[in-house]
Amino acid sequence: MRFKTVDLPYHVYIGENVISKLPKVLRSLDANYFLLLTDEVVKNLVVVNLKETLKDFEYDMMLVESAKMEEARKIVLRGGFADYDAVVGVGGGKVLDVSKVVSSELNASMISVPTTASHDGIASPVASFKENGKPISISTNPPSAVIADLNIIKNCPIRLLRSGYGDLVSNISSVKDWQLARDLVGEDYNEVAASIAVMPAQLMVSKADELDLTLPPHLLMLLRGLIMSGVAIAFVGSSRPASGAEHKFSHALDYLGYGNGTHGEQVALGTIIMEYLHEKYYGRGDWEQIKMSLEKVHAPTTAKEIGLTREQVIEALMLATKLRKKRFTILEAVKPTKEEFELVVEKTGVA
């Protein structure tokens, strides 16, 4: 029998005022001296209120200016001789992604303190950047702890919460793609990781009629789902449970520089399209339910809402069929033509 070591977040706190748990988490990680990474806005809104909480600890604070590998390298160089016990990232995706890379490079524990709930990077072992306008993903160590305080996150723009909903819902089509790869090309499949990723997404979709993402109980559901999505990725050491053809579509939009959508908004549109294909060819998609659930939370369901034309959507879909060919998805299984994509975006109302 073979065994594999899996690194997962050791502490996860989600709720109101859980930022008060930060000293406890730091002590449990023997982090007497740490690096706190944040940005200018969060520093003035959130970090300024942590001074009393952190009065018994020694720490340095640096500001993250951009979501780039070069930014992470600069911080590593500046802090390379400090011998930090931990890196505490307080902020949105930009800060958390840089914090993951810095903590991995410095061989220090990472504590994720999100101020938004816009995607599953809160707890995942993946950092996403744009280099020369192109998206890249970097494998990192997962956070050792996640502290998601509802009193902080509820103040982020509602668009970012809807984006997080879109990213979580995309797991439904991602897992279907993984199952296709298992059935058609014999890819390894992990039922536990798949369930961890897809069950919270299915729960949110089933409750879309009553969801108000600004209410603490519903925001709690969203955060749990996004954190579990990150844990599923860490569990198998791959983004497979949470990234399928819908993410290829989003990456294609990023490569082409089209539109003004967030990551979650782009993958949500991609999910509607890929669910249509799953339903048409394999009878196990439900694009109408996905679209309806996105509409219920007022997330975009059309290209126009995120600054895309029909032609740009089709071009991105065609490019998506050429990206990451080793990741088998519905696109590799059915090889849609441009004409079919045109039919799909019309039938679904995406464009």
UniProtKB/Swiss-Prot annotation:
The main location is cytoplasm
Q: What is its EC number?
A: 1.1.1.261
One of this protein's Pfam families, by short name?
A: Fe-ADH_2
Where, by residue number, does NAD(+) bind?
A: G93, K94, V95, L96, D97, T115, T116, A117, S118, S124
Q: Name one GO biological process term.
A: phospholipid biosynthetic process
Tell me the cofactor note.
Binds 1 zinc ion per subunit.
State the family named in the UniProt similarity comment for this chain. Answer: Belongs to the glycerol-1-phosphate dehydrogenase family.
Fetch the PANTHER family from UniProt: GLYCEROL DEHYDROGENASE (PTHR43616), GLYCEROL DEHYDROGENASE 1 (PTHR43616:SF5)
Q: What is this protein called?
A: Glycerol-1-phosphate dehydrogenase [NAD(P)+]
High-level lineage: Archaea, Methanobacteriati, Methanobacteriota, Archaeoglobi, Archaeoglobales
